[in-house]
Regions:
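Conserved nucleotide-binding/hydrolysis micro-motifs of P-loop NTPases
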Residues: 97-98, 120-124, 154, 163-168, ...
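Long insertion/accessory domains within large nucleic-acid-processing enzymes
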Residues: 95, 381-394
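Residue-level signature of catalytic and energy-coupling elements of molecular machines
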Residues: 19, 25, 44, 72, ...
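Alpha-helical scaffold elements adjacent to nucleotide-binding pockets in ATP/GTP-utilizing enzyme cores
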Residues: 25-29, 40-43, 103, 144-148, ...
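P-loop NTPase switch module centered on the Walker A-proximal segment
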Residues: 2-102, 111-124, 128-133
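Residue-level "contact hotspot" at macromolecular interaction interfaces
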Residues: 17, 68, 107-110, 285, ...
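Conserved catalytic-core segments of large NTP-driven translation/proteostasis enzymes
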Residues: 177-370
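Conserved C-terminal guanine-recognition region of P-loop GTPase G domains, centered on the G4
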Residues: 107-108, 114, 118-200
Length: 394
C-alpha cells in the first residue's frame, strides 16, 4: 500500500484494436468517478471540436501529445489514477495501433488487470483478424494484445464490447452475443485456458462515449442481466465495469520483504527538478535517501549509480513505494555520460544479490514471424520494460 493512500494499489491496462474506444472509455470512466472536472471537460470538448473530432473529448483527457490528438490515436502509454470503494487504481491506456506495439508491451508489463476492448461496430472483424503475412493480411490488434496479455502474466481480465450505441449494434443482444462468442473462441485460440475464459472472464456490453454499463447499469440494454464470475471459491455478480474493478479484481500477493527490484520504463529530464525515472516496483520497498545502481548499464569500470531524492505517485510525494506501485523517482548524482536506459533494473547499491549473467533459461513465444527461423535471424526481444535486438545463433 502506498504511503499516501489507505487503499491497496492495482494497475489496469486498457488494450485492444485502434479505434476500439480505449481512451474514450478511460476518460469517461474517470469523469464518472469525479477525476475529470466539468471545466476541464469543457476545454477538451472545445479542443476536439477545433480539430474536427467532436467525439474525442474524453479521449483527449488521456491523449495529451499534440500528434496523438491530431491523428486521433494513442501513441505512448498514459497513466492516470482513480479510486473505487475498495481499491486505488493506476489506469494505463495502451496504444492500439500496430506501429506502437512496443509501447503497448511496456504498459501491459506493469499491469495486474487488463480490460480488453473490442468494437461492436464494423471494425470488429478487423480487430480480431488472424492475419496472414504471405497474403499481406494484418493481424488484428485485439487478437495480438490478447495473446500478449497472457504471455506477460496478467491473470485478471475483462472483455469490453464497446460502442454498443453504434448503428451496427443498436444496443441489441444479438450483436453482443455474436461478439462475445467470437471473443471467447479467439481467447482460447491465442492461449487462454477454456475453463478460465468461461468462468473467470466477464464479457461486458458497454458504450464508453455514452457511459452505458460503466458505473451504472444501462437503461438502453434492458436484456442485460449481468455476469457471474468465479473468483477463487466465490461467485461474484457484476453488472458494470465498476463492479468488475471493485468486486471481481483482487490484489496479487506482493513480495514486500524481497530485495528491491524496479524495471525502468521511462527516463525524463524535468526542468527545475532534474532526472526523473519512471517504473513499477516489482518487489521490495523504494525509499528516498537510498543509493541505487542500474543493471546491466552499471559496470565496475563504467558506473551507473545515483541516489533516490524523492518518490512520487501521480504527482504526489510519498514516503515510500511498495510492490505494484507505479512511481516517478527524482534521482540525484547520475553520470550524464552513462545514464540509465529503459529496461534497466534498479536495485540498492548495498544489494549484491542481483548480478549479470551470460545465459539464462526462458520460455519464449514467437509472434508474427513471416518466414522460417534460421541462424542469423534477428528480432526484438521483450522482457519486462526492456525491448532489445536479438539474433538466432544456433
Amino acid at each position: 500500500m502506498a504511503a499516501n493512500s489507505e487503499k491497496q494499489h492495482l494497475s489496469i491496462v486498457i488494450c485492444g484494436h485502434v479505434d476500439s474506444g480505449k481512451s474514450t472509455t478511460t476518460g469517461r470512466l474517470i469523469f464518472e468517478l469525479g477525476g475529470l472536472p466539468e471545466r476541464e471537460l469543457d476545454k477538451l470538448k472545445a479542443e476536439a471540436e477545433r480539430l474536427g473530432k467532436g467525439s474525442f473529448a474524453f479521449a483527449f483527457f488521456m491523449d495529451r501529445q499534440k500528434e496523438e490528438r491530431e491523428r486521433g490515436v494513442t501513441i505512448s502509454c498514459t497513466t492516470k489514477e482513480f479510486f473505487t470503494e475498495k481499491w486505488h487504481y493506476t489506469i494505463i491506456d495502451a496504444p492500439g495501433h500496430r506501429d506502437f506495439i512496443k509501447n503497448m508491451i511496456t504498459g501491459a508489463s506493469q499491469a495486474d488487470v487488463a480490460l480488453i476492448m473490442v468494437p461492436a461496430d464494423g471494425n470488429f472483424t478487423t480487430a480480431i483478424a488472424k492475419g496472414n503475412h504471405k497474403a499481406g493480411e494484418i493481424q488484428g490488434q485485439t487478437r495480438q494484445h490478447s495473446r500478449l496479455i497472457n504471455l506477460l502474466g496478467v491473470k485478471q481480465i475483462c472483455i469490453g464490447v464497446n460502442k454498443m450505441d453504434c448503428d451496427t449494434a443498436g444496443y441489441k443482444q444479438t450483436r453482443y452475443d455474436e461478439i462475445g462468442n467470437e471473443m471467447k473462441s479467439m481467447l482460447v485460440k491465442v492461449g487462454w485456458k477454456k475453463d478460465f475464459v468461461e468462468k473467470n472472464t466477464p464479457v461486458m456490453p458497454i458504450s464508453g462515449w455514452m457511459g452505458d454499463n460503466l458505473l451504472k447499469k444501462s437503461e438502453n440494454m434492458t436484456w442485460w442481466k449481468g455476469f457471474d464470475v468465479e473468483v477463487g471459491s466465490e461467485k461474484i455478480h457484476v453488472d458494470t465495469i465498476y463492479d468488475v474493478l471493485d468486486k471481481m479484481c483482487r490484489v496479487p500477493e506482493r513480495p514486500v520483504s524481497a530485495p528491491m527490484r524496479m524495471p525502468i520504463s521511462g527516463i525524463y529530464k524535468i526542468k527545475g527538478v532534474g532526472d526523473v525515472l519512471a517504473g513499477r516496483v516489482e518487489q521490495g520497498v523504494v525509499k528516498p535517501g537510498e543509493e541505487v545502481v542500474f543493471l546491466p548499464t552499471h559496470t565496475v569500470s563504467n558506473p551507473c549509480t545515483g541516489k533516490v531524492f524523492t518518490v512520487e505517485m501521480h504527482h504526489s510525494r510519498v514516503d515510500f513505494a511498495n510492490p505494484g506501485d507505479n512511481v516517478g523517482l527524482n534521482i540525484k548524482g547520475l553520470d550524464k555520460n552513462n545514464m540509465p536506459r529503459s529496461g534497466d533494473v534498479m536495485v540498492y547499491k548495498k544489494d549484491s544479490t542481483l548480478g549479470q549473467t551470460r545465459e539464462f533459461t526462458a520460455q519464449i513465444q514467437i509472434l508474427d514471424i513471416p518466414n522460417e527461423i534460421k541462424v542469423g535471424y534477428s528480432q526484438l526481444a521483450s522482457c519486462a520494460a526492456a525491448v532489445l535486438p536479438a539474433a538466432c545463433q544456433s
